[in-house]
Amino acid sequence: MNNFSIISEYKPAGDQPKAIDEIIAGLNSKKRSQMLLGITGSGKTFTMANIIERTNRPTLIMAHNKTLAAQIYSEMKSIFPKNAVEYFVSYYDYYQPEAYIARTDTFIEKDSSINEQIDLMRHSATRSLLERRDVIVVSSVSCIYGLGSPDLYYQMTVNLEPGKSYPRDKLLNDLINLQYERNDIGFERGCFRVKGDNIDIFPSHYSDKAWRLSFFGNELEYIHEFDPLTGEKLAKLDKAMVFGNSHFVMPQETVNSAISGIEEELQKRLEFLKSQDKPLETQRLNQRTQYDLEMLTETGSCKGVENYSRFFTGRNAGEPPPTLFEYLPEDALLFVDESHVSVPQIRAMYNGDRARKEVLVEHGFRLPSALDNRPLKFEEWEKFRPQTVFVSATPGPFELEETGDTVVELIIRPTGLLDPECIIKPATNQVEDLIGEIQATIAKGFRVLVTTLTKKMAEDLTAYLQELKYKTSYLHSNIHTLERIEILRDLRQGTIDILVGINLLREGLDIPECGLVAILDADKEGFLRSEVSLIQTIGRAARNSEGRVILYADKMTKSIDKAMSETSRRRQIQQEYNEKHGIIPKTINRAIHALAELEKVDSKLDKKQAHTLFDNPAKLKAHIEKLKKDMLKAASNLEFEQAAKLRDQLKTLEEAALELS
């Protein structure tokens, strides 16, 4: 059995050893829920990693959005390079669910765009959970949505071992049943091809490796792992397991049984609609469902097949759907990161999904069984979750109630950094005062974060600061992940001095160069100026030894008072620790991800180099192909900065190739 093994130059320090021991003691005493209160910069991720290593249990880490999940995944992958660290989030780049607006008699068809790279990583995650124990899966809250049955998924695998006999036609048919596509011309993920005595399979969980099965008659002689781009053999395998190209693969008998169940429900529903004198809904439901049944009979699938998932999984009406939680072993461990946001998200998901689908069922677009294609209810999630550690700097009421207000604190930072000094200034003329503070902060070589209440105010402030010749950018929800990372990189490098946003705390900004956080209209009570939001925003300045926070307010609200009191308490604890151990706080000098490599490519220089180094067009083409492969690999590892750098290089080299041709 593989054990977890941390590879790091750091050892637990500050509050970390005590917190690790307390959490592990709680796990050993069978506590179902624990609360880890970890402030910004206290090393929450490293603490979680040490708990995982000490307990040696498969682990699921839930985060409230893809970006935070990606950050945790990247950190865990660097801490556990020898173990399986996986990423499981929604694979939709774009998703428009089907819906019906009765008021205007408008039906909106489902429309979506699937990210192939994330789909690959989802397959890799479920495969790892079924094959090994040293697994950490970092997931967004979308892991509570329905997934294919783990029993069927595992049952449908094709096990391959050299020396054994596999009738050729049966093996090819098995691959097709796993929803692999035969393609002897284009070879890509989820495909197989046949060449003489060889069968090449491109597994659903790989982007840069494929398997070559070499036969003598029906006997499998060798399994080679090879590079699908170059054909280079990478390794000889003793065995291989081919998992489905979809989490919803199923044997034909299951499909036949499901079709019978759908037909039976359809007849009952049609009779009900007729009794309600709804001829339009009756005709609509019959037409749509009969078409789906024909597709299922002929191809084994149909558009919107997930709406019939209850019949494929053998669940009864109202029972919870299979989710990622059913892929976890019984002794798994769960961390819920930023639980004050994640837990309310889990609560809200079921009701929103249910309301939309009830309208579809009522108006004859879907059978009632479509209601069972859903996320878990909160109480179902409560039932399924294993031993859980909630992690947050600002715990919510549910976590505190679950843990009996017993909180394991992670307040002392090993770096000695204090919580920032907080100052209240009048909101009247706040922008004019802010300009002066910005000048003083930039003069010290630091950066500034400004948070406003509305998008309009953020846009206007950004435009005003740019007019005054300040290097300013605006961060908002419409910016894609890669562009967001580029903006943060520019901020850290000094290309940008000021970043304006509405809800910066949600962006997970950790900028050691940040010397000032300015909170405009801090006295306007509400979600953006609640105690939790203020504490989280104040934490953005906690990675700089000279970090300050200015709250612009004309009155002292309860939220401001509580946030400042909590910040002061944490600051006092850290000061006492520093004095006792003779620690002088120092700003964290975190690398800007290999600055030299991430600088934007100078196109003229690259073109010149391309002509000099790649005067042979064939070599240049081969180098471009390699860069494409490296870019995709970087993207699959969520190394977006590296992927962006390679993308820029590709663009200039392709221009050079065009000139050379």
From Swiss-Prot:
Keywords: ATP-binding, Cytoplasm, DNA damage, DNA excision, DNA repair, Excision nuclease, Nucleotide-binding, SOS response. PROSITE patterns: HELICASE_ATP_BIND_1 (PS51192), HELICASE_CTER (PS51194), UVR (PS50151). GO terms for biological process: nucleotide-excision repair; SOS response. ATP binds at G38, I39, T40, G41, S42, G43, K44, T45. The keyword Cytoplasm applies. SMART domains: DEXDc, HELICc. InterPro entries: Helicase/UvrB_N, Helicase_ATP-bd, Helicase_C-like, P-loop_NTPase, UVR_dom, UVR_dom_sf, UvrB, UvrB_inter. Transmembrane segments: none annotated. Residues 621-656 form the UVR domain. Residues 25-414 form the Helicase ATP-binding domain. One of its GO terms (molecular function) is excinuclease ABC activity. HAMAP family: UvrB (MF_00204). This is UvrABC system protein B. The lineage of its organism: Bacteria, Pseudomonadati, Pseudomonadota, Alphaproteobacteria, Rickettsiales.
